[in-house]
Amino acid sequence: MTDALKLDWAVTVPPTVEPIDILELRSTTTGSYLRVDFTDDDLVLTALIKSCRTIAEQICSLAFAPQTIQAIWTMPQVNAGSLSGFKLLYDQDFYQYNESLGANPFSPAPFVLQLPQPPLTAVTLFEYRITAFNAWQTWPATVGSPPVANYVVDTLPSPGLVYLQYPPPAYQYRLTYTCGYATLPPDLKLALLQFIAWKYENRVGEDMPAEIQSQFMGNKVWVL
């Protein structure tokens, strides 16, 4: 396997609740972070919360709040319709590994997809299409009776993983999934508060302070 799948993704349902409440910023509230004792800048603060959260998510490759993402994996042009673009869990020829699966149906799945922007909550839809001109088809989580898993979702790792026993040969695979922290970890929340406060007090487009950037980079997740 020399070529990798091309990954494109987008947020289809953005967070409905931000990880930072505006009341946590105003000095009219006990324990607030910013020294702002008026409500005139509420619109500015609301916009900054969203903007800073989005920037921090891009730096960390994390979802700071619950959201829905749609990701598409495209096979390399020379391998379209084959399985050679998948990341193999084992350094073996696929056909040899497929033979081993026949001998032991409980073997680990040989293929894995890494889902960007953890933490992963759930995969709601797995689709594929043979060519760009074909309609998307649903790939069910299980097949047969008794049911046998086509794929297994693991939400514990970061990034989240989808293991596939034998994915359908196709040009593209599309997954829709939910992800994001229900409650932002304290270190990320503090870094986000500091970022918002800095942006509020420095509105001329200066570079992010190294101290704040290092806090985000210390939590960055790498998708291979």
Feature map (PLM): residue ranges:
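Divalent metal-cofactor coordination and adjacent catalytic microenvironments
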Residues: 1-224
